[in-house]
């Protein structure tokens, strides 16, 4: 009830302004009695994945809390994990505004944010300040002005700095809003990146006495052959998980709607079937050797179960959370429990 009132108010605002307002509000109330307006008591439905035990299978996807400012608030809502970021080595403003658009009739969002964030050092300070026992994944990327062929260095810098504070690390090479980034999903560039990250993981495990799993986040706009090659590289480099999928450049299901022709990645309900197809193809290629977190267009509990049936072990929500509110978390967990 409270969320529907808040949503009505925020949907009158510019999308990015509304997002910033929400983050500011959650940041200030996450550990105060005021979190009673959104906190939910949810019966555990544990999932073991990547050698970690999560309290339930529903996580917050990266992009909502880029700088890790509201981890305790999202944990209070009942998320089984919170993925913060995407974070880059240096702060960057992202792309020019406007860069975030609602397509309300389709329950969709288009964004071309461009990894706007305060930098990895700021994120680390926020991770240190977390008071709850939230499972936090950190999604890492490269700075826009770092050449693609040197992008590996940015990922290694971020990994080094967040390692001891993260439950797991997600490697984002699939955002459509950083020029050239998606080229890292292919061939020698992918193998070199994954191999270097795996070696870094081994070094940091020895240094900190703690094994932090690493996952790769992929795009939905891939051919069957490309998915097969990515799966092969994940297996050969012994990655701990895959996250499927990021936003899409396609516009299926939104043609003719206001803002549908804006540049950027499409998320929300129209992405659901495409991301589920990719999850199924990826799962078939991985043959149970590497687990999958399914994300993309989940708007109902049934959507989440479809992704689990397709081969995902856990799911994440973002756009569906914007449109449906915290109740979606509870709905998915309850459906998962009785499945």
From Swiss-Prot:
Domain of life per record: Bacteria
Annotated positions binding substrate: 66, 111-115, 172, 177, 246-247
GO terms of biological process kind: 'de novo' pyrimidine nucleobase biosynthetic process; 'de novo' UMP biosynthetic process
Cofactor, how bound (note): Binds 1 FMN per subunit.
Subcellular localization: Cell membrane
CDD domains xrefs: DHOD_2_like
Cofactor: FMN
Catalysis performed (reactions): (S)-dihydroorotate + a quinone = orotate + a quinol
One of the record's GO molecular function terms: dihydroorotate dehydrogenase (quinone) activity
Chief site of localization: membrane
Entry EC no(s): 1.3.5.2
The protein's annotated pathway: Pyrimidine metabolism; UMP biosynthesis via de novo pathway; orotate from (S)-dihydroorotate (quinone route): step 1/1
Similarity comment text for this entry: Belongs to the dihydroorotate dehydrogenase family. Type 2 subfamily.
Assembly notes: Monomer.
Descriptive protein name: Dihydroorotate dehydrogenase (quinone)
Organism: Shewanella piezotolerans (strain WP3 / JCM 13877)
